[in-house]
Regions:
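Conserved active-site tyrosine of GNAT-family acetyltransferases
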Residues: 169-170, 197
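Conserved catalytic-core motifs of GNAT/GCN5-like acyltransferases
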Residues: 176-190
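Flexible ATP-lid and adjacent glycine-rich G1/G2 motifs of the Bergerat
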Residues: 142
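Glycine-rich acyl-CoA binding loop
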Residues: 135
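GNAT-family acyltransferases
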Residues: 1-132, 145, 149, 190-195, ...
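Conserved beta-strand-loop-alpha-helix junction that forms the acyl-donor binding cleft
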Residues: 157-167
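Conserved GNAT acetyl-CoA-binding A-motif
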Residues: 148-158
């Protein structure tokens, strides 16, 4: 790639003509085939969420979160009431459409509308949603909202560098690993080195195509097993996009 040079022969970034600050995310419902994302509401969601989290056999899913497992529904409800009032992070409940109940939460956080940057975080999925199409669709719906509706340029994922499941999830969802910020956070009385991942807007069309193909009913057998892994579909979509770009430039 040929660098752009300014009047002093210094390399500079690509121009962004007409760029304007993006809107902050709103408290809107996001509908999918398997799930629906609703702005967190303690009165509507706390009971279902506490029950969903109570299906965990131990507290390992909370190791890398700021909180510990809640020991009562009332304790979780108080947390949910405070979280529901927050604008950043903006928390969403994941509603299982088939069961019509909340089974997890995730949020859009660290909003930077001026630069078009936003982060998905505070992902707390119960065993009822883990490793199901619902969990993938929930991530897709929020990513599509950030890129397609709000017009953001960069979508981030950050986690404790020791949190292997989170890192694998980011990679499966198409995020690119960017590095580790050492000694970035102190939480629960211990150090956290933070692993950084991102998706940028130029990558999103291929990822969107892959998500849609993976979530399509025909990608699942009668027993619920996937026919094509998401990674395979992402590789195919990315290759097609690169080929189209090369052809247009030839």
């Amino acid at each position: 790639m040929t660098a752009r040079l300014n009047a002093y022969d210094q390399p500079v970034g690509d121009p962004l003509p007409g760029w304007t600050a993006r809107a902050a995310p709103a408290r809107v419902d996001l509908d999918g085939a398997y799930c629906r994302l609703e702005p967190l509401d303690a009165e509507r969601h706390a009971g279902d969420l506490y029950a969903a989290y109570a299906t965990e056999t131990d507290g390992r899913n909370w190791t890398y979160l700021p909180e510990e497992p809640f020991d009562s529904e009332e304790g979780y409800r108080r947390w949910a009431q405070a979280a529901a009032r927050s604008a950043d992070p903006l928390h969403y409940a994941v509603i299982d459409r088939a069961a019509d109940r909340a089974v997890g939460t995730l949020s859009l956080m660290r909003h930077d509308p001026a630069n078009g940057v936003i982060e998905v975080g505070y992902v707390v999925f119960s065993p009822l949603i883990q490793r199901t199409p619902l969990s993938t669709e929930a991530q897709y719906l929020l990513m599509a909202y950030a890129f397609d509706k709000l017009g953001y340029r960069r979508y981030e994922w950050k986690c404790d560098a020791l949190n292997t499941p989170s890192r694998k999830a980011a990679e499966r969802l198409g995020f690119t690993f960017e590095g580790v910020f050492r000694q970035a956070v102190v939480y629960k009385g211990r150090n956290r080195d933070t692993a950084w991942y991102s998706v940028v807007d130029s990558e999103w069309p291929a990822l969107r195509e892959a998500f849609r193909a993976w979530l399509a009913p025909e990608n699942f057998r009668e027993d619920g097993e996937q026919r094509h892994p998401l990674s395979t579909l992402m590789n195919t979509a990315s290759h097609t996009a690169r080929s189209a770009t090369a052809d247009s430039g030839s």
